[in-house]
A protein has these predicted regions:
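Catalytic cores of secreted/periplasmic or lumenal enzymes
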Residues: 1-267
Length: 267
């Protein structure tokens, strides 16, 4: 959720805002419809407002919660500089345009990350969060890779055939299924580790964007280096990338506001 927030107007908590009768907010955008934990963030904010009203922004609450969630599941700790202010604009179309899509090729990914001041190292490291990721079957996520990759009823040759067969048999049994949940790092998606990268190197990255990481010599070599090294090295580098992402286009000073409730802008 923190990643999805930072890629649209910066890390400003705009992903937390609800839609209204005259505005479709970021939550309504297809890339955000699989996000979970909004109620948890809202509850955290309510506790913060009760203790120190008007001090801690929703953007900071989300950034801190993302860090603590990773630590809780056994991942690394990183510093989260605070002082972000909340945005007042949340637009579904912007989210659709700005959040990297699961069908992005390498060039698309590189451009998307560069637009936010992030480099190829950041791309690889932040993708590593897919080690605890889940997705849904469906043509807008990855099922076209199984059933209709080029529009001719074919399968993506870049996807390991045994893995594809298993997905078709046990998970995404039809192209139209868009509800079945699939682990992005099967067998260890509750463990923050190097499993995702190992899947990618086996041609078992579930998204086109996952597979795209092996299409570039630098990113492919970087993944191989991470996999061959200790998990502690990945943790160190992932933490640095998360701290860097948390600074993307932040609002400070008099820009934005400190929202009282994360789901609505202040009146």
């Amino acid at each position: 959720m923190h990643f999805h927030d930072c890629f649209v107007r910066g890390c400003d908590g705009s992903v937390l805002i609800n839609s209204t009768s005259n505005n479709q907010a970021e939550k309504a955008a297809i890339p955000n419809q699989s996000l979970r934990g909004f109620d948890f963030i809202d509850n955290l904010k309510a506790l913060l407002e009760a203790a120190c009203p008007g001090v801690v922004s929703c953007a900071d609450t989300l950034a801190l919660a993302a860090r603590d969630a990773v630590v809780t599941i056994g991942g690394p700790f990183w510093n989260v500089p605070t002082g972000r202010r909340d945005g007042t604009i949340s637009n579904a179309t912007e989210a659709l345009n700005d959040i990297p899509a699961p069908f992005f090729n390498f060039t698309d990914l590189q451009t998307s990350f560069a637009n936010k001041g992030l480099n190829l190292t950041d791309l690889v490291l932040l993708s590593g969060s897919h080690t605890i990721g889940i997705t849904h079957c469906g043509p807008l996520t990855f099922s076209n890779r199984l059933y209709n990759f080029t529009g001719k009823g074919d399968q993506d040759p870049a996807l390991d055939s045994e893995y594809a067969a298993n997905l078709k048999k046990n998970k995404c049994k039809t192209l139209s299924d868009n509800t079945t949940i699939v682990e992005m790092d099967p067998g260890s998606f509750r463990t923050f580790d190097l499993g995702y990268y190992k899947q990618v190197l086996k041609r078992r990255g579930i998204f086109v964007s996952d597979s795209s990481l092996t299409k570039n010599s630098f990113t492919n070599a970087y993944i191989s280096r991470l996999v061959s090294g200790p998990v502690s090295e990945f943790f160190k580098e992932f933490a640095a990338a998360m701290e860097k992402m948390g600074r993307v286009e932040v609002k400070t000073g008099s820009v934005g506001e400190i929202r009282k409730v994360c789901t609505v802008v202040n009146s």
